[in-house]
Swiss-Prot record, chain A:
It is found in: Cell inner membrane. The gene is cysA. The lineage of its organism: Bacteria, Bacillati, Cyanobacteriota, Cyanophyceae, Synechococcales. It comes from Synechococcus elongatus (strain ATCC 33912 / PCC 7942 / FACHB-805). It catalyses: sulfate(out) + ATP + H2O = sulfate(in) + ADP + phosphate + H(+); thiosulfate(out) + ATP + H2O = thiosulfate(in) + ADP + phosphate + H(+). Disulfide bonds: none annotated. This is Sulfate/thiosulfate import ATP-binding protein CysA. Residues 9-239 form the ABC transporter domain.
Swiss-Prot record, chain B:
Induction: By sulfur deprivation. The gene is cysT. Its main location: membrane. Residues 63-266 form the ABC transmembrane type-1 domain. The keyword Ribonucleoprotein does not apply. The chain crosses the membrane at residues 22-42, 67-87, 102-122, 139-159, 188-208, 217-237, 246-266. The keyword Heme does not apply. The complex is composed of two ATP-binding proteins (CysA), two transmembrane proteins (CysT and CysW) and a solute-binding protein (CysP). GO terms for cellular component: plasma membrane. GO terms for molecular function: ABC-type sulfate transporter activity. This is Sulfate transport system permease protein CysT.
Length: 344, 278
């Protein structure tokens, strides 16, 4: 079948097995040229394997992989014109920052002047001007990862692949680097796929999110689509906190929620808490109050014994003056249920 | 000759921590005094006589054989040691543990036994020697035999110094090199070899000094012909047999000085090759 040039990466019916473990199963995926896509999933979901298959670091058992329209399935890593960034940087420790970035350029036999100029350009791009003569051991984790990124970008890859690029960094650096990567992508516009298990990271950085579980794609969509319209219970519960209730639960009786599916999913911020009984509420009792910063988490126990987790803004919490053991009334603002044939 | 030490005050020793005191006393008894005694013994001769003994043609030829073959043996083990260490760290195969402990055998085997075994196997009628003899190459009782014995006894060093460094290498760095367009050979020379080079050099240095000092196996597999395959340690032994202690100590001192210089050079190379561990 003819492949569209505008498609940066096309993965078609790709499977990969390690021993008896099915890492990736019949995956189809299309990444538009110039877009920034996150592969999101728990560990063992096959997201890293899929990335390595795209890179050519693993060979698929079946299926085809197309890069910028050409069939790259049988191409070796070195011929695929990809840039790969590893979780633990994988810098060449015996080479200076400058030499690390120049590695791919020197292999391509560019002139010395050209290499030097390109390296300086990249040092500036990743904001490491002046650190070119350091060795990796003299850099912080965040700086090392930026060197790794510069090294990958130096050879002007058609596709940039990042495997948990911020996974080894501490929370603060991770946040900074995330928004920096987003800005960088807006400048460089190279087709980018990155792997993460952090849904917040995926939401913040990516144009499109591919949610994976058990080697399969659960859903592909924009961050908003994924959050607002999760396609499966797995996506619903992976992408944010969720209460899972039987459809017979007390709380749905007053509201008249009627679903044939036995399980109903309810986001904590979709539970309204009131002091006085208002229409469509059911009585409940506060079990515990947990302060999460800008939100307050209230654990409420329904009369049937079911415990729900509800989130409410601080202001609302102050207005209500909630206390443990207090009698309240709760109401689901929005709930979601899925057809039966799934597994979490 | 009696060795009179000047009456020194040792109070400085009591001001040191116990570990330091033990270090000083131990090294003094085991290393410093014997080495100093060797040089003093040589130095008790007139300078012209020392020079004469040190540079007599048979000794010079023995130095050449000893250092030349030791360096060659160390270099050979430098190459093959890396390959063996690579196999041991990168592949899993049945009997790997046994294979691994075989590497250390040259350390455990009495060197005379090693020499005898090699001389038998590599003689004209031996298991391996019989296939090489038709090509006009004789191994046992020639320089080739000396080299073989030196390779044998210094085999484990490079394997053991390189193994941990290979285990430490990130496979991801090799994958990164490939993704940047490096061929397998470019990856070896640019990514794998530089970080293990300090270990290779350390192993080569150890193997070299072991080979220079080797006596037991070489004396058996060598023809011990002066100007041909006679090594310096065997020459020293012959001098001692003739009660020529002065000749023996002078040759020994020369051997020691040369070894020190070569070890310093290898050490300097090693420091240079690990300069990035800042």
């Amino acid at each position: 079948m003819p492949k569209d040039k505008a498609v940066g990466i096309q993965v078609s019916q790709v499977s990969k097995q390690f021993g008896s473990f099915q890492a990736v199963k019949d995956v189809d995926l299309t990444v538009e040229t110039g877009s920034l896509v996150a592969l999101l999933g728990p560990s063992g979901s096959g997201k890293s394997t899929l990335l390595r298959l795209i890179a050519g670091l693993e060979q698929p058992d079946s299926g085809r992989i197309f890069l910028t329209g050409r069939d790259a399935t049988n191409e070796s890593v070195r011929d695929r014109q990809i840039g790969f960034v590893f979780q633990h940087y994988a810098l060449f420790k015996h080479l200076t920052v400058r030499k690390n970035i120049a590695f791919g350029l020197e292999l391509r036999k560019h002139t010395k002047e050209k290499v030097r100029a390109r390296v300086e350009e990249l040092l500036e791009l990743v904001q490491l001007t002046g650190l070119g003569d350091r060795y990796p051991s003299q850099l912080s984790g965040g700086q090392r990862q930026r060197v790794a990124l510069a090294r990958a970008l130096a050879v002007q890859p058609q596709v940039l692949l990042l495997d948990e690029p911020f996974g080894a960094l501490d929370a603060k650096v991770r946040k900074d680097l995330r928004s920096w990567l987003r800005k960088l992508h807006d400048e460089v516009h190279v087709t980018t796929v990155f792997v993460t298990h952090d849904q917040e990271e995926a939401m913040e950085v990516a144009d499109q999110i591919v949610v994976m579980n058990h080697g399969k794609v659960e859903q592909i969509g924009s961050p908003a689509e994924i959050y607002d319209n999760p396609a499966t219970p797995f996506v619903m519960s992976f992408i944010g906190p969720v209460n899972v209730l039987p459809n017979s639960s007390h709380i749905f009786q007053a509201g008249g929620l009627d679903t044939p599916h036995p399980e109903v999913f309810l986001r904590p911020h979709d539970i309204e808490i009131a002091i006085d009984p208002i229409p469509e509420t059911v009585p409940a009792r506060i079990d515990r109050i947990v302060h999460l910063g800008w939100e307050v988490q209230a654990e409420v126990r329904l009369e049937d014994g079911q415990v729900l987790v509800a989130h409410l803004p601080r202001d609302r919490y102050r207005d209500l003056q909630l206390e443990p053991e207090q009698q309240v009334f709760v109401r689901p603002k929005q709930a979601r249920s899925f057809p039966l044939n799934y597994s979490i | 000759m009696s060795l009179r030490l000047p009456s020194l005050s040792f109070t400085w020793l009591t001001r040191l921590s116990w570990s330091w005191r033990f270090t000083w006393v131990y090294l003094t008894l085991i290393l410093f005094i014997p080495i100093i005694a060797l040089f003093l013994k040589s130095a008790s001769l007139p300078l012209g006589r020392i020079w004469e003994l040190a540079t007599q043609p048979v000794a010079v030829a023995a130095y050449e054989v000893t250092f030349g073959l030791s360096l060659a043996a160390a270099a050979l083990n430098g190459v093959f040691g890396v390959i063996i260490a690579w196999v041991l760290t990168r592949y899993d195969f049945p009997g790997k543990k046994l294979f691994d402990s075989f590497i250390d055998l040259p350390f455990a085997l009495p060197t005379a036994v090693a020499g005898l075994t090699l001389a038998t196997v590599y003689s004209d009628k031996g298991w391996i020697g019989q296939f090489i003899a038709p090509f006009g190459v004789q191994i046992a009782f020639t320089r080739w035999g000396v080299l073989l014995a030196m390779v044998f006894i210094s085999l484990p060093f490079v394997v053991r110094t390189v193994e941990p460094l290979l285990l430490e290498l990130e496979v991801e760095a090799e994958e990164a090199a490939a993704s940047l367009g490096a061929s397998p050979s470019e990856t070896f020379w640019r990514v794998i070899l530089p970080p293990i080079l300090p270990g290779v050099l350390a192993g080569v240095a150890q193997g070299f000094s072991r080979a220079v000092g080797e006596f037991g196996s070489v004396v058996i597999i060598s023809g011990n012909l002066p100007f041909d395959d006679l090594i310096a340690p065997v020459l020293i032994f012959e001098r001692l047999e003739q009660y020529d202690y002065a000749g023996a100590t002078v040759i020994g001192s020369v051997l020691l000085l040369f070894s020190l210089v070569i070890l310093f050079v290898i050490n300097a190379l090693q420091n240079w090759s690990s300069r990035y561990n800042g």
